[in-house]
Amino acid sequence: MSRFAHFLAVDWSGAKGPRQKGIALALAKAAGGPPVLLAPPDPKGWARAEVLALLAGLEVPTLVGLDLGIGLPFADAGAFFPGWDASPADARGLWALIDALCAGDPHLEAGGFVSHPEGSRYFRHGKGLEGDRFLLPGASTREGRFRVAEAAQRTAGVRPVSNFNLVGAAQVGKSSLTGMRMLHRLGGAVPVWPVDPLPEQGSVVTEIYTSVAARLGGVTGTATKVRTYAALNDALDTLGSPPVKGTGAIDDHSSDALLTAAWLRRVHTERDLWHPPALTPMVARTEGWTFGAF
């Protein structure tokens, strides 16, 4: 029997603005049944602060999956920001630094960090606009720096993008930075694995990558987005979940959240996923990990 009663998947967005159509929350119950979307308080979409309040107020043991990076690369250079004396020593220090430098940004946005005279040097901002520290000296690829977990993600058949990359439809840098602001403000109200040890009871927040869930749900090919109810229900069936109601098209934010909530329910008892070989104490403390990467 699961120690979690609920499985909550959050498809996140780092876009500007008070409310985001790109944020979707879905809940699967340990007792069974199809995953369900949680309606935002406003038809215009979720505010990031509302998601923060929901997480801080969880009343039943919930395994939360956030589709964002909870850390930045550290192991490859022994620092998040090599050459910058303000570079923090661990993930919680990173979250605090980002939140402090973005204090003037509304809606948990992160413009203040990526435009900071030092911080901006580590990011790719646009075509032909790349910070002088985006790449490490002697880098073998132009893709940017990656965390240890992202190397593990590739073994699942997906292609992660560097969290230092702010360009393109697949970039996750902005969403990760806004998510780190939220995690800082969560302030330990809910443990964040593996930055914090996995608690024996209560709720816990993890990082997820919805493409990994899609792969394990049987979605194949170069694209891992599910855009029809029929395809979503096929994937849910593979994960042992009852289907959701609906026909025709579904937006990929909603399908990502629904599929991943069911996936969390299906795989959370697999001990190996909580103990991947490359997850050392240093990696846990600094970069964090993607639940499901092995």
Question: Predicted regions span which residues?
Answer:
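RNase H-like (RuvC/DEDD) metal-dependent nuclease/polynucleotide-processing core
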Residues: 2-8, 12-294
